[in-house]
């Protein structure tokens, strides 16, 4: 009679262990979202950059911290927000807002810039902004995916691990490509340095030859040779 409960406990323990191990693996290899609080002042600008890979999804949310909960924010607590790509393409633009969200897929690899501008106000106002920026696997809404697909949390964790594995695979190829580019750059640099060294040697020997010729002519005129 006790076999079934015992097996159930063993299965439940194994399941917890598997979930724990999966969670630890994801914490080690998955790109974490950046959550921060920015201190703003009227007339000031603060920018944050994030290195995002091509085809990575990125999600950002921001909101001004209300110093008096239950009351409206004062008129001085407003933001101008812009998000731009490494080449300057705008992915988000908002004016005179208290909160907002941006979602896009990176079209190129590089540093994406998010800038917060607090408009000028008199008297000067100070306030805080909560900002969370997620990219890659971390940016996906796994709770919504689980609800839509009607799948278990174990299946969600497995899908996360698959996405993490694919991400690592892509980054490995990118690292290999960068290494190849660096090797080509090194070869090109070495070739140029060799050519420059040869040119310097030729110029030096030519100048030395001219000096010897001039010295010989001078000594002959003085009848020292």
From Swiss-Prot:
<keyword id="KW-0472">Membrane</keyword>
<keyword id="KW-0325">Glycoprotein</keyword>
<keyword id="KW-1133">Transmembrane helix</keyword>
<comment type="function">
    <text>Involved in vesicular protein trafficking. Mainly functions in the early secretory pathway. Thought to act as cargo receptor at the lumenal side for incorporation of secretory cargo molecules into transport vesicles and to be involved in vesicle coat formation at the cytoplasmic side.</text>
</comment>
<feature type="topological domain" description="Cytoplasmic">
    <location>
        <begin position="211"/>
        <end position="225"/>
    </location>
</feature>
<feature type="short sequence motif" description="COPI vesicle coat-binding">
    <location>
        <begin position="218"/>
        <end position="225"/>
    </location>
</feature>
<dbReference type="GO" id="GO:0016192">
    <property type="term" value="P:vesicle-mediated transport"/>
</dbReference>
<dbReference type="Pfam" id="PF01105">
    <property type="entry name" value="EMP24_GP25L"/>
</dbReference>
<feature type="glycosylation site" description="N-linked (GlcNAc...) asparagine">
    <location>
        <position position="186"/>
    </location>
</feature>
<feature type="topological domain" description="Lumenal">
    <location>
        <begin position="36"/>
        <end position="193"/>
    </location>
</feature>
<comment type="similarity">
    <text>Belongs to the EMP24/GP25L family.</text>
</comment>
<keyword id="KW-0931">ER-Golgi transport</keyword>
<dbReference type="InterPro" id="IPR015720">
    <property type="entry name" value="Emp24-like"/>
</dbReference>
<keyword id="KW-0333">Golgi apparatus</keyword>
<keyword id="KW-0256">Endoplasmic reticulum</keyword>
<dbReference type="InterPro" id="IPR009038">
    <property type="entry name" value="GOLD_dom"/>
</dbReference>
<feature type="domain" description="GOLD">
    <location>
        <begin position="45"/>
        <end position="160"/>
    </location>
</feature>
<feature type="modified residue" description="Omega-N-methylated arginine">
    <location>
        <position position="178"/>
    </location>
</feature>
<feature type="short sequence motif" description="COPII vesicle coat-binding">
    <location>
        <begin position="218"/>
        <end position="219"/>
    </location>
</feature>
<keyword id="KW-0732">Signal</keyword>
<feature type="transmembrane region" description="Helical">
    <location>
        <begin position="194"/>
        <end position="210"/>
    </location>
</feature>
<keyword id="KW-0488">Methylation</keyword>
<dbReference type="GO" id="GO:0015031">
    <property type="term" value="P:protein transport"/>
</dbReference>
<keyword id="KW-0175">Coiled coil</keyword>
<keyword id="KW-0812">Transmembrane</keyword>
<dbReference type="GO" id="GO:0032580">
    <property type="term" value="C:Golgi cisterna membrane"/>
</dbReference>
<keyword id="KW-0813">Transport</keyword>
<feature type="signal peptide">
    <location>
        <begin position="1"/>
        <end position="35"/>
    </location>
</feature>
<feature type="coiled-coil region">
    <location>
        <begin position="175"/>
        <end position="188"/>
    </location>
</feature>
<comment type="subunit">
    <text>Probably oligomerizes with other members of the EMP24/GP25L family. Associates with the COPI vesicle coat (coatomer). Associates with the COPII vesicle coat (coatomer).</text>
</comment>
<protein>
    <recommendedName>
        <fullName>Transmembrane emp24 domain-containing protein p24delta11</fullName>
    </recommendedName>
</protein>
<dbReference type="GO" id="GO:0005789">
    <property type="term" value="C:endoplasmic reticulum membrane"/>
</dbReference>
<keyword id="KW-0653">Protein transport</keyword>
């Amino acid at each position: 009679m006790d076999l079934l409960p015992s097996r159930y406990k063993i299965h439940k323990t194994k399941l917890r262990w598997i979930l724990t191990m999966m969670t630890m693996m994801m914490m080690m290899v998955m790109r974490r979202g950046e959550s921060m609080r920015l201190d703003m002042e009227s007339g000031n600008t603060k920018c944050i950059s994030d290195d995002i890979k091509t085809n990575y999804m990125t999600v950002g949310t921001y909101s001004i911290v209300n110093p008096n909960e239950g009351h409206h924010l004062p008129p001085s607590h407003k933001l101008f927000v812009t998000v731009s790509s490494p080449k300057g393409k705008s992915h988000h633009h908002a004016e005179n807002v208290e909160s907002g969200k941006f979602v896009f897929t990176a079209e190129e690899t590089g540093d994406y810039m998010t800038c917060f501008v607090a408009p000028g106000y008199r008297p000067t106002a100070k306030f805080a902004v909560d900002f969370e920026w997620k990219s890659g696997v971390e940016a996906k809404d796994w709770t919504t995916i689980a609800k839509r697909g009607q799948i278990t949390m174990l299946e969600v964790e497995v899908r996360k691990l698959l996405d993490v594995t694919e991400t690592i695979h892509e980054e490995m190829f990118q690292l290999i490509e960068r290494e190849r580019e660096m090797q080509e750059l090194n070869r090109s640099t070495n070739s140029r340095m060799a050519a420059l060294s040869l040119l310097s040697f030729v110029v030096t020997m030519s100048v030395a030859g001219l000096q010897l010729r001039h010295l010989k002519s001078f000594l002959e005129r003085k009848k020292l040779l």
